[in-house]
Swiss-Prot record:
Residues 38-98 are annotated as: Disordered. Belongs to the vesiculovirus protein P family. Homotrimer. This trimer is stabilized by binding to the L protein. Binds N(0), and N in ribonucleocapsid. May bind to host ref(2)P. GO terms for cellular component: host cell cytoplasm; virion component. Phosphorylated by host kinases. Phosphorylation play an important role in facilitating trimerization and possibly P-L complex formation. This is Phosphoprotein.
């Protein structure tokens, strides 16, 4: 195609476009109500006497205007819309915004999730604590299924191993709600409790032996001072808890068929002992809270490396 033919086609297209624009302008102008060009003036008749003028003016109101003199496009519509105040609109918008309520919990649960994944909400209830993970509705479906599957596997292991009736509620995949009971459903068989009993028996036998002065440091919580420790926690030795916990493994069902199950230890999931202490309390259900409160970002990284999600 020569340059001349290209130029001619461009000019033809431009002419068609100009014609289309003019047609649209004509249609718009025809839709608008035309403004009357004639102007009507109100004049006084000189031959009108004062009595006649007073009688005419008495019938009508002083501020009344002849409706025939008002153009149609200036007449008021029957319906009047009143905008609400901006403050009321802001209050209505704030009521519909998603909020996460945080309260001081005697059990000291800290989920440890950042706002980038899910936002947890903790609330007390008779006999236990509810932990609700909001924000799962916007997560990728594969990740959401993985999180739900991971939580179910983890909660089943905790309940079977330590005798806690932990329930998981999954409402259409939008959020997960975990119920942590305050008391186990059967006798506590945790090794640290047994160690504590042996230590108490040993100390009762060695009462007569003199001891030197020992400095007793009572911890009031974690590094941020969030979790106040109760009397039961002060009596026990929290140092032995990490030694037991870091070797515990959490085994998850394989994400794909013909794949071995994924087994991770608490040491793999937590960075250090200090981070572990930030995610569990030394009062009653340390293992359960630590396992439920592991950071999903670290677990997801492990799963991603293994299954290439």
């Amino acid at each position: 195609m020569s340059l001349h033919s290209k130029l001619s086609e461009s000019l033809k297209a431009y002419a068609d476009l100009d014609k289309t624009v003019k047609e649209i302008e004509e249609q718009v102008s025809s839709m608008e109500e035309p403004v009357p060009k004639t102007v009507k003036y109100v004049t006084f008749e000189e031959n009108l006497s004062e009595e006649e003028w007073e009688s005419d003016s008495g019938d009508d109101d002083e501020d009344s205007i002849d409706d025939s003199l008002i153009p149609d496009y200036l007449r008021e519509s029957s319906s009047i819309t009143v905008d609400e105040d901006e403050e009321d609109q802001k209050e209505d918008m704030e009521e519909h915004l998603p909020t996460v309520s945080w309260e001081e919990e005697p059990t000291g649960i800290d989920i440890g999730f950042g706002p980038g994944i899910v936002m947890p909400s903790v609330s007390n209830h008779e006999g236990g604590t509810y932990v609700r993970y909001n924000g799962l509705g916007g997560v990728d479906p594969n990740c959401k299924d993985l999180i739900s599957k991971m939580m179910r596997s983890l909660i089943g292991q905790i309940g079977n191993k330590y005798g806690y009736d932990i329930d998981l509620f999954d409402y259409q995949g939008d959020f997960l709600e975990v119920f942590l009971p305050h008391k186990p459903s059967k006798e506590d068989v945790r090794p640290d409790i047994r160690i504590g009993k042996k230590n108490e028996e040993g100390t009762s036998k060695q009462v007569s032996k003199p001891r030197g002065k020992e400095k007793i440091v009572l911890k009031t919580g974690d590094e941020c001072g969030r979790f106040p420790m109760n009397k039961e926690a002060k009596k026990r030795e929290p140092e032995g808890l990490w030694e037991v916990m870091k070797v515990l493994s959490v085994q998850f069902d394989p994400w794909k068929e013909d794949e071995p199950p994924l087994s991770l230890t608490i040491r793999d999931l937590f960075i250090s002992e200090s981070e572990f202490r930030l995610h569990c309390n030394h009062s009653q259900t340390e293992r359960e809270m630590a396992l439920v409160g592991i950071k999903l970002r670290r677990l997801y990284n492990k799963l991603y490396q293994k299954y290439r999600l």
